[in-house]
C-alpha cells in the first residue's frame, strides 16, 4: 500500500513540475522568442537540473508542443464560454479573432518566426485552429437548435 501511494505522489510531483516548466517556457517564449530561450535558461530559471528538464521533455520542440497544447486548452475554454453566451456565429467568430489579436499583441514577433522551424508544432497549430473554430461554431449551432426545439415544444 505504501508503495502505491509513493508512486502516485511521484506522478503527481512530476506532473506539477512539468506544468511549472510549461508555464515558465510559455512566458519566456512569448517574451523573447523560441530560438533565444535555451533549455538551460528554463532549467536555471526554475532552479531545476537540466536532467530533470530532459527527463520530462525530449527536446525544445516537445516543450514547445506542450506550450502550444496549453494555449489550445485555454482557447478552447474561452471559446466554449463565448459560444454559450453568444447570440450568433458572427459573435463567436468576432470574439475568436479579438482574442487571437490580443494574444498576437502580447507575444514577441520572433516567437511566430521561430515556431515555423518546428514542423510538429506547425502541424499542431493548423489542426488546432480548425478544431477550435469548428467546435465553437458547432457549439453555437447546437445551442440554436435547442432554442428552436424548446420554442416548438412550448408552442404545443
Give the label of every model feature segment.
Residues 31-34, 55, 84, 150:
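Helix-turn-helix/winged-helix DNA-binding modules
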Residues 101-145, 149-155:
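Short secondary-structure transition hinges
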Residues 1-32, 36-45, 62-65:
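Basic, helix-initiating cap at the start of DNA-binding domains
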Residues 24-31, 74-85:
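Solvent-exposed, amphipathic alpha-helical segments
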Residues 47-57:
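Short hydrophobic/aromatic patch on the recognition helix
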Residues 66, 77-106:
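Hydrophobic alpha-helical connector segments
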Residues 8-12, 16, 58, 62, ...:
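Residues at secondary-structure transition points
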Amino acid at each position: 500500500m505504501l508503495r502505491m501511494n509513493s508512486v502516485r505522489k511521484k506522478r503527481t510531483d512530476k506532473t506539477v513540475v512539468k506544468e511549472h516548466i510549461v508555464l515558465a517556457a510559455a512566458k519566456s517564449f512569448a517574451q523573447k522568442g523560441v530560438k533565444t530561450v535555451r533549455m538551460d535558461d528554463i532549467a536555471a530559471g526554475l532552479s531545476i537540473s537540466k536532467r530533470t528538464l530532459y527527463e520530462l521533455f525530449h527536446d525544445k520542440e516537445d516543450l514547445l508542443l506542450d506550450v502550444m497544447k496549453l494555449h489550445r486548452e485555454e482557447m478552447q475554454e474561452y471559446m466554449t464560454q463565448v459560444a454559450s453566451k453568444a447570440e450568433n456565429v458572427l459573435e463567436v467568430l468576432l470574439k475568436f479573432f479579438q482574442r487571437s489579436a490580443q494574444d498576437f499583441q502580447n507575444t514577441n514577433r520572433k516567437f511566430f518566426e521561430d515556431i515555423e522551424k518546428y514542423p510538429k508544432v506547425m502541424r499542431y497549430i493548423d489542426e488546432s485552429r480548425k478544431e477550435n473554430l469548428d467546435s465553437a461554431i458547432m457549439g453555437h449551432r447546437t445551442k440554436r437548435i435547442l432554442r428552436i426545439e424548446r420554442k416548438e415544444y412550448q408552442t404545443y
